[in-house]
Amino acid sequence: MPIPIDVSYGRSFSGTRRRIYQLLAEMGTSGDVIWPFASQPFMRSPGPLTPGRTEEWHSGVHAVLEEVLPEERIVWRFENEGVNGTHGFYLSQDEKKTKVTHRTVATLSDTEGRLFWRRLEDSHSRSMEALFAKMERVLKR
């Protein structure tokens, strides 16, 4: 039986949407200054973010860029077996701050997808918290 998931993590930052988008767009490249775990690298294919072409790999996730709208969102489609859905970063205004939300919306197959999410769920939560903490430090520089 397929299992739907909808998981979000968010935080508001003092940085501009332009700067925060730039930091997110550079993740997995030589310009990445916010991925928190050097021993568990975040990698993406080289070049500009191009839907249908740019790929990413991290924490057991393999995804292809589905949509990019500068200063608004970067959305990836899972390529992992048993997972049908997306995860991405969404930027919005929160009074004088910029809110960043990472949202995962997917349907998991009963076997592969459920096992994949079980392995990923805890590290995903820690990664989001650490990423947001590092982004906050970088934006204060």
Model-identified regions with their sequence ranges:
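Hydrophobic pocket/interface hotspot
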Residues: 20-30, 65, 74-76, 100-102, ...
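Short, highly charged C-terminal tails/helix-capping segments
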Residues: 37-44, 132-141
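Short beta-strand segments that buttress and anchor functional surface loops
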Residues: 50-58, 74-80
